[in-house]
């Protein structure tokens, strides 16, 4: 699998700008809308916080990160905890949930447009992240990819439960 974009930070940088713009516009164009959708949006936003924070804790504990180094500087593949559910909890699942949550809370076309564009870029960037992990961890990561979904946490939870039932 080839990288979609050669510059490693291009997609995430553009997606970041779109997400910041989406959030800023949501404050200005927050429409009265369906309260149920707003509640679902807030649930998405709080859930994104879980997927955003757990990798920091998990990588520090299980990733072989040297003291004083960034939690991203892992030396071993982590496939437990949140990483047994999704492969990209921060740059994938959390990002998508933030975009979705803001869309549902704001309920405005500008929020939906910016959010969808950011979601597409973040998802495509997860393919680049997979490629980087294959280069770093090799066949072990490719086998991990077969067990754990990229960003779909519902499918990840179902697969995890099924694996545990078989064990």
Question: Which residues does each PLM region occupy?
Answer:
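Histidine-centered phosphotransfer motif of kinases
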Residues: 85-93
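Membrane-anchoring alpha-helices and their flanking helix-loop junctions
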Residues: 1-80, 94-167
């Amino acid at each position: 699998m080839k990288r979609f974009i050669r510059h490693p930070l291009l997609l995430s940088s553009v997606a970041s700008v779109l997400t910041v713009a989406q959030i800023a516009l949501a404050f200005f164009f927050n429409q009265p809308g369906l309260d149920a959708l707003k509640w679902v949006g807030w649930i998405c936003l709080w859930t994104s916080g879980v997927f955003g924070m757990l990798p920091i804790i998990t990588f520090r504990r299980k990733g072989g990160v040297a003291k004083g180094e960034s939690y991203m500087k892992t030396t071993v593949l982590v496939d437990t905890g949140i990483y047994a559910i999704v492969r990209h909890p921060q740059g994938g699942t959390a990002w998508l949930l933030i975009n979705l949550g803001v869309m549902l809370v704001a309920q405005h076309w500008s929020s939906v447009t910016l959010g969808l564009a950011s979601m597409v870029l973040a998802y495509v960037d997860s393919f680049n992240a997979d490629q980087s992990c294959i280069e770093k961890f090799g066949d072990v990561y490719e086998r991990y990819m077969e067990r754990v979904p990229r960003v779909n946490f519902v499918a990840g939870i179902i697969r995890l439960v099924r694996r545990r039932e078989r064990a």
